[in-house]
Swiss-Prot record:
Annotated TM spans: none
Localization of this protein: Mitochondrion inner membrane
A GO-annotated cellular component: cytosol
Reported function: Plays a role in the assembly of the F1 component of the mitochondrial ATP synthase (ATPase).
Membrane topology: Peripheral membrane protein
Transit peptide, residue positions per record: 1-40
Name of the protein described by the UniProt record: ATP synthase mitochondrial F1 complex assembly factor 2
Keyword Mitochondrion in annotation: yes
Keyword Mitochondrion listed: yes
Gene field: Atpaf2
N6-succinyllysine carried by residues: 133
Phenotype seen when the gene is deleted: Essential for embryonic development since it is impossible to obtain homozygous Atpaf2 knockout mice.
Length: 289
């Protein structure tokens, strides 16, 4: 059985304070952002300004309504998603906010904004190439040579994931103790490229988001393919850090916060991938407190 181990990562927050008077709702401050990032960095928070959240079907998909105003993206596009299930999930994010809207907890909304606005203007092929490139620096392919206890830990916990991926997708991966990492065969890249090509643009945005959290394409594949749970994937991605924490200790509250936050982001990204692969119809749904 795979054991699960606990990666600290930095987070940045912005500020937001803007009045709304338009029949469409854009809750993002200032001009449309153009950062060289994979996804928008959401503003921090603001006072809740709506009471009811609903979804409805429009010509381009499913829309989110805050009271009687339609939600918009940071670039002032109508916030429209491709499936009813995703619309319900996003609406739930907005409906679950209390007196204060905490944008940094609304990962599905952020991913939708990124997919709709595509701030970095990347094509499907570019998204796929970026995802495949993660194999070159995949966390579980990089191994240490010492201490022996960590060497054994990596072998016991990470090797089963690699073996599963090799068998599942019919590709060769391997691992290495070299700083250059393992040599990934061209055929492996082609197989992974072909697999990722089966996903639409929205799902690819979600895949890249999850890979960025876990620093591992292989763990992401295992998670999306239901071979791993979110908890397993997250803690396997933190294997070496957890080893060091067990040996040297840690600041408990900081460790717990980062772990829970990483789980939330990873879970949201994974859910986003699956929901973006679904399609359905809806007449009108109202979500009320």
């Amino acid at each position: 059985m795979w054991r699960i181990y606990p990666r600290l990562r930095d987070r940045w927050r912005g500020l937001l304070d803007r009045r709304l008077s338009d029949p469409t709702v854009s809750v993002w401050p200032g001009p449309a952002p153009q950062p060289p990032a994979r996804a928008y960095v959401p503003p921090t928070e603001r006072k809740r300004f709506y009471q009811n959240v609903s979804i409805s079907q429009g010509e381009g998909g499913f829309e989110i309504n805050l009271d009687h105003r339609k939600l918009k993206t940071p670039q002032a596009k109508l916030f429209t998603v491709p499936s009813e299930a995703l619309a319900i999930a996003v609406a739930t994010e907005w409906d679950s906010q209390q007196d204060t809207i905490k944008f940094y907890t609304m990962h599905l909304t952020t991913l939708c904004n990124t997919s709709l606005d595509n701030p970095t203007q990347r094509s499907k092929d570019q998204l796929i190439r970026a995802a495949v490139k993660f194999l070159d620096t995949d966390t579980i392919c990089y191994r240490v040579e010492e201490p022996e206890t960590l060497v054994e830990l990596q072998k016991n916990e990470w090797d089963p994931v690699i073996e599963w991926a090799e068998k599942r997708y019919g590709m060769e991966i391997g691992s290495s103790t070299s700083i250059m990492g393992p040599s990934i065969p061209t055929q492996t890249r082609e197989v992974l490229t072909s697999h990722l090509s089966s996903y639409n643009m929205w799902a690819l945005q979600g895949i890249e988001f999850v890979v960025a959290q876990l620093k591992s394409m292989l763990l992401t594949l295992g998670l999306i393919d239901l071979r791993l749970t979110v908890e397993q994937a997250v803690l396997l991605s933190r294997l070496e850090e957890e080893y060091q924490i067990q040996k040297w200790g840690n600041i408990e509250w900081a460790h717990d916060y980062e772990l829970q936050e990483l789980r939330a982001r990873t879970a949201a990204g994974t859910l986003f991938v699956h929901l973006c692969s679904e399609s359905s119809t809806v007449k009108h749904k109202l979500l009320q407190e």
